[in-house]
Amino acid sequence: IGTGSVELGYIFTLGPEFVPKLVNGFINEEGNSKVKFTFGQGTTSCLLKDLKSEKYDIVFSSIAKDEEEIEFAPIMEEELVVIVDKDHVLASKSSVDLAEISEYPFIAFGNKSGIRQIIDGLFKAVDNKPNIICEVEENNAIAGLVEVKYGISIVPKITALKYFNVKILPISNPQHKRYIYMATLKNKYQSPTMKMFKKYVEEFCRKNSLG
């Protein structure tokens, strides 16, 4: 233990902050300094496909239906917010009801993204449909388009949003919770290093009130 390797895949929102802090904390634990990590990013669909082909040992992603080979363990909650440019008519609001935004051009996540199904479900819950003008896979790319007034969007509330000139609006309706999951193959051998890392992930998220 302490000298193995972990192949880790994760969705884009976790790249700037969560994964670096997590891994740094793990390798600085006594006995873990020689553990080697390989990293990859992608959409939930692509990550789970690569998990099943054993490119990855562990994936952090949204949950997916009909994946009987995969065990999903919730590790953290991620708030979804509406973002608009600073001059947008919605920018004066303190929160947004999704039933009231269908008239505005909407920048959506692509269909391969796990978050797309969640956002579609939120609109369905208020009997509404967004006016989708384009699809983008990555959060920062969406924020950049919103900043230049190409459209509005719904994204996870991540630290990187502060680097864009956008207004962040909480969603008042519908009520929602979005979770990030740790995904592993049910019937695959798990090395001592992998088991140790999984346990650390659970403790890290609990300690940081993410779970």
Predicted region positions:
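A late-sequence structural motif
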Residues: F18, I168-G211
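Central regulatory/effector-binding core of bacterial HTH transcription factors
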Residues: T3-E67, E135-V136
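Short, well-ordered beta-strand segments
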Residues: S5-G9, V59, I83, I107, ...
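Flexible hinge/capping segments at coil-to-helix
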Residues: E67-F106, S191-P192
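Secondary-structure junction motif
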Residues: P105-V126, Q190-K198, C205-G211
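Hydrophobic hinge/microswitch elements
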Residues: T43-L48, K52-K55, S61-S62, K112-L169
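Beta-alpha-beta core module
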Residues: E67-E79, N140-N187
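Short loop->beta-strand "edge-of-pocket" segments that line small-molecule binding or catalytic clefts
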Residues: E7-G9, L80, V96-I115, C205
